[in-house]
Amino acid sequence: MRLSQFHLHTTKETPADAELVSHRLMLRAGMIRKLASGLYTWSPLGLRVLRKVEAIVREEMNRAGAVEVLFPTIQPRELWDATGRWEKFGGQLLKIKDRKEQEFCYSPTAEEAAAEFARQEINSYKQLPLNFYQIQTKFRDEIRPRFGVMRAREFLMKDAYSFHLTDEDMAREYDNMRAAYTRIFTRLGLDFRAVQADSGAIGGDASQEFHVIADSGEDSLAFSTGSDYAANVETASAAPPAPRAAASEAMQQVATPTQKTCEDVAQLLGIALQRTVKSVAVMTQAGFVLVLVRGDHAVNEIKLAKVPGLADYRLANESEIREHLGCEPGFLGPVNTARPVRVVADRDVAALADFVVGANVSGAHLVGVNWGRDLPEPETVADVRNVVEGERAADGGELRLARGIEVGHVFQLGSQYAQALQATVIDEGGKAAVMKMGCYGIGISRIVAAAIEQNHDDAGIIWPAPMAPWQVVVCVINPKQDPQVLAAAQALLDQLLAAGLDAALDDRGLRPGAMFADMELLGIPHRVVVSERGLAAGTFEYRARTADAAESLDKAALFSRLGH
């Protein structure tokens, strides 16, 4: 391919609203152009990258035994009413009417369509298991589309839906898909982690996310140095605490007139922050609850909501706090409460001895507090906190925290969607059985942006080789002035293509500096320059995208450097 015959339009200017590096570089490289808020046209260059990602995803899904289908993007309201998601999905669901006033939605995901297809097509357990996947445009009506294709309203997604007779078979396919996803992201050349996750609005029992590691990631991840353990901070856990030590201090009240935070109290008393206890007051349908975490820890809202009776909790207001504890916020504690309250203690708090809590008296705290002596053992002990960088993991390693961009998610859905849409089969006993479902998504267009967030420098994109628009670009100096140089460059291009390399010829006639800057901006892994001087010496100028300088190589050395 000659770039003079290819639409390539790079720019130096970046719109002011392009916040992320990937958004800026994709615009500057001419990969995308904005059509409307959250809607982007993919240029020929951008589409080359997108199709390369799509091809690897398709190959690995086929290898894993899934079969490709294509569901409609426009889906009838009846299906979404059956599962309750017509209302539950909220404002992100784009709802439309046809000329007959019948209601439809623009599919943000396709569990309903897949379950309906399975109901129509599968009637016997002998046909199971089956895994259908599609690569299809989706639409979610984001309130504030931002970050380019990272959070666009319209995006390209691979979504798969598997159907099973038993939970055990569903779990086997879940593992099969996790392995396929690992192969996909490995082949794409990305630094990623598969993490335990919360199932969120889609639901289900087991859930795992795949994140590309990047400083700009919206999600906070924790992973261990001792194994492949990794989890979203929503679900991550550290090693359990050591057994509680024996009490060694007497409880006494101390004045803390202006110290309302654990940090200030610890500094005043000259003690470690880990010995203080933070009291968080919440309200549930059942009443007032006091949640306790160590002063150096933070409550994890997702974990707390999973504690029995706290699914609907909210923070208590000041009047509710005064009613139950008899004091103002800043001095709260579980000792001497005005009314009986339920106490939920993080397991690290339950393991403390001689700790410090608010005295439920304005301007005072209690020191030397101990469970079983100064207050009852906590009614509920659970892991309800965020993990901390460097603490011990359950496998003995250290926990490390990183930011991640979610690019894939796998779920074990169970029977909720199949039950709602009456997707049943005849089982071995001749009875109707509701099928079990798994669902598995990959954000194909999001992968492109995530790869750039992870791989770039001041000059531009640094593509992992499998994703680059071309592996090699042959650059010609003064192609119009020297036909021999152009002919030699074309001959080299033909040899590169014959060797199986995805290569292009830059014959646009740009100044060398501008041409080389474009190649760096576009993230081309290998740049080869053909010039009159080089031909006279029998060499080519070669530079890898990440190299500090160019080098002169003869043809044999060049092909060796390119892995051929």
UniProtKB/Swiss-Prot annotation:
Key words of the record: Aminoacyl-tRNA synthetase, ATP-binding, Cytoplasm, Ligase, Nucleotide-binding, Protein biosynthesis
A GO molecular function for this record? aminoacyl-tRNA deacylase activity
Quick check: keyword Nucleotidyltransferase in the entry?
no
Say yes or no: keyword Lipid biosynthesis present. no
Q: Name one GO biological process term.
A: prolyl-tRNA aminoacylation
Q: Which GO terms describe its cellular component?
A: cytosol
Quaternary assembly: Homodimer.
User: Which Pfam family, any one, appears in the UniProt record?
Assistant: tRNA_edit
E.C. no: 6.1.1.15
Q: Any idea what this protein is called?
A: Proline--tRNA ligase
| InterPro entries documented for this protein | aa-tRNA-synt_IIb, aa-tRNA-synth_II, aa-tRNA-synth_II/BPL/LPL, Anticodon-bd, Anticodon-bd_dom_sf, Pro-tRNA-ligase_IIa, Pro-tRNA-synth_IIa_bac-type, Pro-tRNA-Synthase_IIa_type1
The domain comment in this protein's record states:
Consists of three domains: the N-terminal catalytic domain, the editing domain and the C-terminal anticodon-binding domain.
Query: What reaction gets catalysed by this protein?
Result: tRNA(Pro) + L-proline + ATP = L-prolyl-tRNA(Pro) + AMP + diphosphate
Which protein family is it in?
Belongs to the class-II aminoacyl-tRNA synthetase family. ProS type 1 subfamily.
Cellular compartment(s)? Cytoplasm
Its function, per the record, reads: Catalyzes the attachment of proline to tRNA(Pro) in a two-step reaction: proline is first activated by ATP to form Pro-AMP and then transferred to the acceptor end of tRNA(Pro). As ProRS can inadvertently accommodate and process non-cognate amino acids such as alanine and cysteine, to avoid such errors it has two additional distinct editing activities against alanine. One activity is designated as 'pretransfer' editing and involves the tRNA(Pro)-independent hydrolysis of activated Ala-AMP.
